Each structure stands twice: as structure tokens, then as C-alpha cells.
């Protein structure tokens, strides 16, 4: 969320920030909620591709793919963050991953959609189906 210049002249971000704004007064929006996810190197496809964000106010959910890093630039989570969303709050609901080991190529979640009461997550290697109501994995299809 905060960006610094590194010693070589490039930039490094300090985590991923999500915010909710109170726009009751459109000319003076107020940050009502904020969360910083991960450390420098944390990445989400949604930073560069708006289609990677799944949002449904009627379902009360928001989801996006995420590769989270720690202080030493090591990845400690690769998958999707799922949030409960209402008019006045955002709360983490579930974290879904396709990874079965630390270094599995092609298991990074790149898209999330919902159909009915099910959430579908897609990576190059898998498609998983999760119940929105229970957060449980219902099905998995290996694409390899």
C-alpha cells in the first residue's frame, strides 16, 4: 500500500491495502475501514486487472486472488481472500488455496466467480467449488 523507492531506483510496495469509504458527503469521503495485507512483495492480480475482483453486494461477498509475503519477502499464502461485505463493514470470511506444497507452479488462483450459492476458484491446474454458506470445499477438478 505504501510505496518506497529501492536502492536501484525501482519501487517496492509495503503490502496490499483495502479500504471502505463513507461517501455520505461525496466531496469529503472518509475512510471507514482499512486493512493492510502482507508485507513488501504482496501481490494481487486485481492491482492490474479489474476482472480479478469478484464483488456481489447482494451476496455480501468480495473476493480476490492474493500472493501474500512476510517481512523477508517469502510467500506465506497463495490463494484467494474472501470477505463478508455490508454497507458498514468488511470482515474476512475465508481464505482458499489451491496449493498443496510450498512450490507448486500453476496453483496460483487467478479468478473467482460465483454461481448460485457456490464460489468457483480457478488456477492453471485446478478449479475448486466452495459453498458460500458453509465455506466448505464441495468439489475439485484437476486440469493438469
Q: What are these language model-derived features?
A:
Residues 1-144:
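Feature marking well-ordered beta-strand scaffolds used for ligand recognition
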Amino acid at each position: 500500500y505504501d510505496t518506497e523507492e529501492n536502492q536501484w531506483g525501482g519501487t517496492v510496495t509495503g503490502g496490499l491495502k483495502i479500504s471502505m469509504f463513507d461517501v455520505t458527503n461525496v466531496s469529503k469521503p472518509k475512510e471507514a475501514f482499512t486493512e493492510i495485507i502482507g508485507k513488501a512483495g504482496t501481490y494481487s492480480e486485481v492491482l492490474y486487472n479489474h476482472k480479478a475482483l469478484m464483488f456481489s453486494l447482494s451476496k455480501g461477498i468480495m473476493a480476490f486472488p492474493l500472493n501474500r509475503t512476510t517481512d523477508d519477502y517469502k510467500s506465506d499464502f497463495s490463494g484467494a481472500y474472501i470477505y463478508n461485505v455490508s454497507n458498514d463493514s468488511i470482515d474476512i470470511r475465508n481464505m482458499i488455496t489451491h496449493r498443496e506444497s510450498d512450490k507448486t507452479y500453476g496453483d496460483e488462483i487467478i479468478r473467482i466467480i460465483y454461481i448460485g450459492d457456490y464460489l468457483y476458484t480457478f488456477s492453471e491446474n485446478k478449479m475448486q467449488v466452495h459453498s458460500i454458506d458453509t465455506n466448505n470445499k464441495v468439489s475439485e477438478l484437476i486440469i493438469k
